[in-house]
Each structure stands twice: as C-alpha cells, then as structure tokens.
Amino acid sequence: MEVKICGLRHPVQAQAIAALGFTTLGFICVEASPRYVSPREIELVLQSLTAHDKLSTIGVFANVSLPKLREFLAQTSLNGIQLHGDESPDFCGQVKQAFPQHRLIKALRLRRSADLERAEAYYNAVDVLLLDAYHPEQLGGTGQTLPWQKLQQFRPPLPWWLAGGLTPSNVQEALNLLQPDGIDLSSGVEQGPADKDLAKVAQLRAQLDALAILQH
C-alpha cells in the first residue's frame, strides 16, 4: 500500500520523512492554502532528497487552468499531479494527454456516500482516485474523516486512495475496515500548516509496520 505524506515545505522534515520509508510526497500548489509552496520551495525540497531514489513527488492543484498548470510544472521536477478541485472528467483527460509522463490523481470530496456515483466518470481519465472529506471552505487538510463503513463496497477498476482525517491513532481502524491502494495524510501528522510533526510521522510508521502493509 502506498502512503502519501502531503503538505510538505521544509527540506529537513522531508528528508526525515523519506528516511522513515515514506516515498510518496505531496506539495500544495494552491495559493489560497496555508500549506502553499512555490515552485522554488518545492525544488529546494526535492534537491535535498537526491539521496533517495524512486520518490513519487506530487503537486496538488485545484481548479487551475491548463496553461497555469503547464507554467508551474515547467519550474519543478514533480512527477505527479493531483487535482483537488471541481475538475471534470474531460479536463482530467486533457491534463493526462498534456502530461503523459506524470501520474494523475483526481480527488473526490464527498459530502455524502451517494457522491461516490461520480467516481465512475473518471475511471478512464486518471490513474488514481482519492476520496477525501468535503469541507465548504477548505479543499483538504481539514481533519474530517469519511464514513468508512459506507466505503466498504467501493471497488473501482483503478487504484484508489483514502484521505480525510487520518492520523496515527485511527489509521489501523480505517485499514481494518477498508483496503485502499493508498492513504494520504496531511493535518494528521503536523503541528501546524506545512509544519510536520516528525514524532507523529514515526508513530504512523509504527502503526503501519504493525499491519505490515507499508509499500517499500
């Protein structure tokens, strides 16, 4: 199972997180977010991680135009794109065509379990679906969990990741109920926006080791 630690900003923290075995790292590229990082800040982090190979580095965008996305990515060496806004399946397909070398993740923010019906429209447009909790004012990192029991029948024909309020304290409960292909944590392992709590990240590693599911 893949584990993404999202909302990184500080090179030293990113190095420590990678050293713990977390090789999927997320960077918030939405200017309105308190976790926003500029292309230059992202590159400073990535340059500090050259000792770690096979990293998956994902930029998180929301409702960005294709030209703006192209401009941002041209300034970084990110190898993944996460769309976390109201992007249509058609737009996702355009992004996939424009950036075929980048893994494309589409986040669906669920207000109710019936919102899962929207997922099918994205099956052929993206590489990964991510399920997150809906918040009217925040796109992610809200600390709110999804109703895990209601997701037990979700079996899309492509990889899917679970997000939304995951912490070292509840990750085992979530994974005892569900079998996602990945999980995504942000606020659950930080002490402030984009300021990761390395003790919590280590606790997360210990919890996942107990389940023997962390992908190496």
Where are these regions (language model features)?
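Conserved N-terminal beta1-alpha1 strand-loop-helix module at the mouth
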Residues: 1-216
